[in-house]
Amino acid sequence: MTSKAVVFAYHDIGCTGIEALLNAGYEIAAVFTHADDPRENTFYASVARLCAERGIALHAPEDVNHPLWLERIRQLRPDFLFSFYYRRLLGAELLACAARGAYNLHGSLLPRYRGRAPANWVLVNGETQTGVTLHRMVERADAGPILAQQAVAIDPEDTALSLHGKLRKAAGALLRDSLPLLALGVLPEVEQDESQASHFGRRTAADGLLDWHRPARQLYDLVRAVTQPYPGAFCQVGEQKLIVWSAEVVAGNHGREPGSVLSCDPLRIACGEDSLVLRFGQRGERGLYLAGTQLATELGLVEGARLRGPASGPQRRTRVLILGVNGFIGNHLSERLLRDGRYEVHGMDIGSDAIERLKADPHFHFVEGDIGIHSEWLEYHVKKCDVILPLVAIATPIEYTRNPLRVFELDFEENLRIVRYCVKYGKRVVFPSTSEVYGMCQDPDFDEDRSNLVVGPINKQRWIYSVSKQLLDRVIWAYGQQGLRFTLFRPFNWMGPRLDRLESARIGSSRAITQLILHLVEGTPIRLVDGGAQKRCFTDVDDGIEALARIIDNRDGRCDGQIVNIGNPDNEASIRQLGEELLRQFEAHPLRAQFPPFAGFREVESRSFYGDGYQDVAHRKPSIENARRLLDWQPAIELRETIGKTLDFFLHEALREREAQA
């Protein structure tokens, strides 16, 4: 019986995959591809042309995961989906359309070099082997079980173009051997070894900058990784750009400074280790392709001259405005940015106890104040700074029912004013959305771009925080369509030192773990709301802040206009389990003897704890594919470690409180 396939394909290997399917006897019901980008050098074969010649139905939608396209694909009733160098991620609903599974051909030996541009990256990194992999598609990019692989040797003289040719041949051979077995259902699958996984993002022309302080071998690898048809490696000669198309490594650098011209015939440049002969290149984007010797003459180079790589002079630090700088995220983020050395942090908050350790840093500027009052200071600093983070918010569940109007006024109205200042002055805003916006969504994993945002009835006032944040997300998105640069990030239950204060927990206005620790410290029963069965995914603040710092860094602008969940799906636990692990570590803590005996667990109804208008959520687990793809980020800290350092912080705080009262 003929197997029916729907194919997602682009590039040479897209054509190779389509030809292989036809040769293996598959029926191709439709092909989805991309319209060629006029800004891109399309040196590869055309999937559109091939399909036209073969009489195959072809589509190029902007969003293949759109419900309209999902329904059309379902109506085709495919046995298989195949992706051959298609450039967009296929969502879970789309993958489920295939009765016998969805499969991707990836241009590396997975699990190494997941992600974008693997053929370029293996050359940049000096690898001697790569290959192609046929694997089952899962929601995580390039992470599904492997069905077949074929290795490809990388020769010292290979360029990205020659290596791509080798990969194309390997792909053809692998598919020729594998597709018939797949149709018969006899091709075994092997899970990927996550400990060996590596992930690489897309490359841009700016990544071709030559840093002469690096070893010549590394620069040679960069040149061959980005030479024609790619934009090329480059450096500066005075005010002129020199693009290098071909080079070779020569031993020694005569002890000269990196970037020094050692000779003009051949054109040889000293590197941090050894030297590089520039064989061919061109002046600027529109120059002629010339030999290195002629380039030296036309550029006016002489022995001893210096070529420039990355700017070596002092650069202005990026100014980051953090409103709510004394809060949990604000103080940890400030510390991380100041440690980086590339940022100047300006902050405002109504207190400063959590940032006292930062005040001595000359690049940290703090003003004590209220964003609702100090509007002139606020507008001036939005205008002055480069990146704006409005972190001021009421984010404790009991306040959602106790002070709903205050939640709306601060979390929506005051922050909307800040967003409008960003629009007015053309500033980038990194806005803290929340995992609460997903509400009672029933998806197993909450996806930023696909999950529905579901909240309860109007009389359940606990949702005022969720909808205030969601509405502001939508306003920011709408401003983004008019040119506002933004990123929305959604923290999932971040924990760590300085999360709250025990004093806040005493009045009920704190996060769950702080409330639990307060009960241990004071010897009162740990209250489990509705039995504590609710599950959350807890994220260590150090993991979360690292992701947020990468959003602020925004390499290649990849975070612009994006929504990013920041959470740890592997750290899922119920509130009861959280309490039990806290108790275990509390009993083993060196300070245990300083506190009263454990008073037990007590189950309470949510209404008695939070008051009328509360409604809870059974689970809240993030999809972190956007964070992996955009930030090359993966949370690493286990829950028990996070609980341990959070507990330790609050136990020491409790003793300090006791000493102060003595």
Curated annotation (Swiss-Prot):
Record keywords, A-Z: Antibiotic resistance, Lipid A biosynthesis, Lipid biosynthesis, Lipid metabolism, Lipopolysaccharide biosynthesis, Multifunctional enzyme, NAD, Oxidoreductase, Transferase
Catalytic residues identified in the record: H106 (proton donor), E436 (proton acceptor), R620 (proton donor)
Gene Ontology MF annotations: carboxy-lyase activity; UDP-4-amino-4-deoxy-L-arabinose formyltransferase activity; UDP-glucuronate dehydrogenase activity
Residues annotated for (6R)-10-formyltetrahydrofolate binding in this entry: R116, V138, E139, R140, A141, D142
InterPro entries: Arna-like_SDR_e, Bifun_polymyxin_resist_ArnA, Epimerase_deHydtase, Formyl_trans_C, Formyl_transf_N, Formyl_transf_N_sf, Formyl_transferase-like_C_sf, Lipid_A_modif_metabolic_enz
Annotated NAD(+) binding sites: D349, D370, I371
Pathway: Nucleotide-sugar biosynthesis; UDP-4-deoxy-4-formamido-beta-L-arabinose biosynthesis; UDP-4-deoxy-4-formamido-beta-L-arabinose from UDP-alpha-D-glucuronate: step 1/3; Nucleotide-sugar biosynthesis; UDP-4-deoxy-4-formamido-beta-L-arabinose biosynthesis; UDP-4-deoxy-4-formamido-beta-L-arabinose from UDP-alpha-D-glucuronate: step 3/3; Bacterial outer membrane biogenesis; lipopolysaccharide biosynthesis
Region (Formyltransferase ArnAFT): 1-307
One Gene Ontology term from the biological process aspect of the record: lipid A biosynthetic process
EC numbers, comma separated: 2.1.2.13, 1.1.1.305
One Pfam short name: Formyl_trans_N
Catalytic activity from the UniProt record: UDP-alpha-D-glucuronate + NAD(+) = UDP-beta-L-threo-pentopyranos-4-ulose + CO2 + NADH; UDP-4-amino-4-deoxy-beta-L-arabinose + (6R)-10-formyltetrahydrofolate = UDP-4-deoxy-4-formamido-beta-L-arabinose + (6S)-5,6,7,8-tetrahydrofolate + H(+)
Site, as annotated: Raises pKa of active site His: D142
Region (Dehydrogenase ArnADH): 316-662
Binding site for UDP-alpha-D-glucuronate: 395, 400, 434-435, 462, 493, 527-536, 614
CDD domains: Arna_FMT_C, Arna_like_SDR_e
Protein family according to the UniProt entry: In the N-terminal section; belongs to the Fmt family. UDP-L-Ara4N formyltransferase subfamily. In the C-terminal section; belongs to the NAD(P)-dependent epimerase/dehydratase family. UDP-glucuronic acid decarboxylase subfamily.
Subunit structure: Homohexamer, formed by a dimer of trimers.
PANTHER family associated with the record: BIFUNCTIONAL POLYMYXIN RESISTANCE PROTEIN ARNA, UDP-D-APIOSE_UDP-D-XYLOSE SYNTHASE 2
Protein name per Swiss-Prot or TrEMBL: Bifunctional polymyxin resistance protein ArnA
